[in-house]
Amino acid sequence: MRCPSLARLPHRAVSGLTRTPVRFQSQAFLTARCASTAALRSATPVHQSVLNRRYQQTRNASGTAAAVLEAAAQTPDSLSQEAIIENLDPVEAERLSRVRNIGIAAHIDSGKTTCTERVLFYTGRIKAIHEVRGRDSVGAKMDSMDLEREKGITIQSAATFCDWVKKDEDGKEQKYHMNLIDTPGHIDFTIEVERALRVLDGAVMILCAVSGVQSQTITVDRQMRRYNVPRISFVNKMDRMGANPFKSVDQINTKLKLPAAAVQVPIGAEDEFEGVVDLVRMKAIYNQGSNGENIVVKDEIPEKVRELAEERRRMLIETLADVDDDMAEIFLNEEEPTEKQIKDAIRRATIGLKFTPVFMGSALANKSVQPMLDGVIDYLPNPSEVQNTALDKKRNEAQVKLVPYNALPLVCLAFKLEESSFGQLTYIRVYQGTLRKGSYVFNARTDKKVRIPRIVRMHSNEMEDVSEIGAGEICAVFGVECASGDSFTDGQLGYTMSSMFVPEPVISLSIKPKHSKDYANFSKAMARFQREDPTFRVSFDPESEQTLISGMGELHLDIYVERMRREYRVDCETGPPQVAYRETISQRVEFDHLLKKQSGGPGDYARVVGWLEPTGKLEENQFEEQIVGGSISEKFIFACEKGFHLSCEKGPLIGHKVLGTKMVINDGATHMTDSSEMAFKNATQQAFRKAFQEGNPAVLEPMMKTVVTAPAEFQGDVIGLLNKRGATINDSEVGVDEFTVYADCSLNGMFGFSSHLRAATQGKGEYTMEFSHYEKAPPQEQRELVKKYLQAQADRHKK
């Protein structure tokens, strides 16, 4: 038998695992496993007639949960999501069916925060609507930083909890709980989007009705695919001049390569935008009231859009027939699908990552946001319908499934940290078990035991204290010292969540407070920002005696410098941007190095023999020992390995990290009294420096995947700008009124590009960059970098 709402569930493995076919398994499978579970064995047979019915049911339920947990750990591939759902406690199944963990993501300035503001208003989360650039601390809850309100961009992901009351077809009202996360659109804050998608079960992708799919929309799409997050689409700004929602639908199909079809058509557009026609129910929907809070549904579709609505409904059914077997059968039999059949097909295809339904409206004009919320309930999965995995540290990090049962041992993830007036606020997603106030949990990374003093949910203008949070929900806790991405358990399981994808920083700045009295606050700010943001790094360069901050781009670091000034009242001086270069060798070099210092008393003696060679890929460095006969003891080998890794932290060429280099030690010699771990560490470092210089060394520079979008008339100017910077153009797309160029550019060549692009395109061009890979810098640039480094070293020695 096929369950229409669960036919194609996403097999979501957060570490990018491949999807496997969904299999149904009966209760009998788990009953048999349950019977063999040691915890449930009994010396005497248990008879229903003897025991209290309720006690027996509770015992059976806990036994089934234990059996499911065992199957999830031992044979995760054979345990289907349907079997997990089938064996859910009925009360738990009802609770989870009413939960949605969703995010809102899109290109910058597509109206994410404006849309979220309406969602909060219509769900009763806030009492009045306030715009993105406003100064009201209530209305601008999702942009709570002054910096966000001034710049009109979202920097951090803001999380909130709200209730949405949806009317069923029979008119009965049902309350659903939504955990909603608003995310940044700017590429420099991409870690915020990664963190949000990591813990969400579904997303709303917002597009501009005028611009359609833009460069950052493509990045967000790639992130959603990485975490297998199903999404519905919302074409916003239908009241703007030049609004064309069907261009967005076409671009989702062509640019994002994702089948899409409109589930609504607009009644009017631009200044005359009145409402939408629901293509599933074939009814007209209008918003009334000063803030569009009243929904009016009419059976009569306006004559001016009737033909368009019928045509688009046919296209919706045809698209669904391409991605859903049941709808294909109905379509081939030339039958007219019912409203329920269309809804079920949309839900199956959306959750199966094969389709996205496209809604349309205008958040700023307070029109058609509520039908989009109904779409979240109808078409996005609840927590029990999504597969999540963890790693079992006790079994060599074997992959296990997480089961959203409250009765099972706790597994949860801290995905975001914030400072508040009450202390550190930690956002947590519970995947399995129950998180209770006052309970103790174990940090899987540090193995430290931590007490949970307070649990809150963001609700109705304030934090709502709760005593416990069940599986599948998101909450915030106070008083827990941890880092972003830490996993927590109750100690019964040795599970850790596979970590989020965290890109390496590509740009650095030297930074110091202008006034020495500010060093205490400066240190506090640095420590806090590092805990909150894994892509923000702080280091100290002992040679230049400078503190360096590293991040994803100029804006990323500028925001933190500005936050330090506003939140900690620390004015800072920053140096010019520094590129994160790397060093490597190009050929194999053998070495035989002797360190010998014997001038009376304890001396140093160490001889190391081996070779350096490139690994073939510009990835991690490798150390290997191939010693036969014990010429170097094991403790000295460890010292050699330590010396190698220390050498890789600061290369001989320009003082940057070494990449893609392998050291092999296959012989050596020791002295009975003068050999020590320190001597072998130093000998390895000296051998490394000498051999590295002989191995045809090279400087590597970071290459950035760059996407430039501008009006079509500026295509020649933009191509010229990229060519001047030595970019490699990989692809280009020319639309009706704009074009997009995809190129690989060196980060060093892209400094100042934004101002030149604005000048060349009359302020209409935009671009995004993200790290792609390392490759050798041009010879002239390498020579200049080496010369500059040697000069700096000489100047330092003179002092």
From Swiss-Prot:
Q: Which InterPro entries match?
A: EFG_II, EFG_III, EFG_III/V, EFG_IV, EFG_V-like, EFTu-like_2, G_TR_CS, P-loop_NTPase
Locate the tr-type G domain: which residues? Answer: 97-384
Functional description taken from the UniProt entry: Mitochondrial GTPase that catalyzes the GTP-dependent ribosomal translocation step during translation elongation. During this step, the ribosome changes from the pre-translocational (PRE) to the post-translocational (POST) state as the newly formed A-site-bound peptidyl-tRNA and P-site-bound deacylated tRNA move to the P and E sites, respectively. Catalyzes the coordinated movement of the two tRNA molecules, the mRNA and conformational changes in the ribosome.
Disulphide-bonded residues: none
Lineage summary: Eukaryota, Fungi, Dikarya, Ascomycota, Pezizomycotina
Which PANTHER family does the protein's record reference?
ELONGATION FACTOR G, MITOCHONDRIAL
Residue range of the transit peptide in the UniProt record, numbered on this chain: 1-24
Q: Which GO terms describe its biological process?
A: mitochondrial translational elongation
What the record says about family reads:
Belongs to the TRAFAC class translation factor GTPase superfamily. Classic translation factor GTPase family. EF-G/EF-2 subfamily.
List the NCBIfam families. Answer: EF-G, PRK12740.1-5, small_GTP
Its localization reads:
Mitochondrion
Mention any one GO cellular component term assigned to this protein in its UniProt record.
mitochondrion
Q: Where does GTP bind?
A: 106-113, 182-186, 236-239
Q: Which GO terms describe its molecular function?
A: GTP binding; GTPase activity; translation elongation factor activity
User: PROSITE patterns this protein is in?
Assistant: G_TR_1, G_TR_2
Q: In which pathway does it act?
A: Protein biosynthesis; polypeptide chain elongation
Keywords of the record: Elongation factor, GTP-binding, Mitochondrion, Nucleotide-binding, Protein biosynthesis, Transit peptide
Domain of life, per UniProt, equals: Eukaryota
Annotated SMART domains: EFG_C, EFG_IV
Q: Where is the signal peptide?
A: none
Protein name, UniProt field: Elongation factor G, mitochondrial
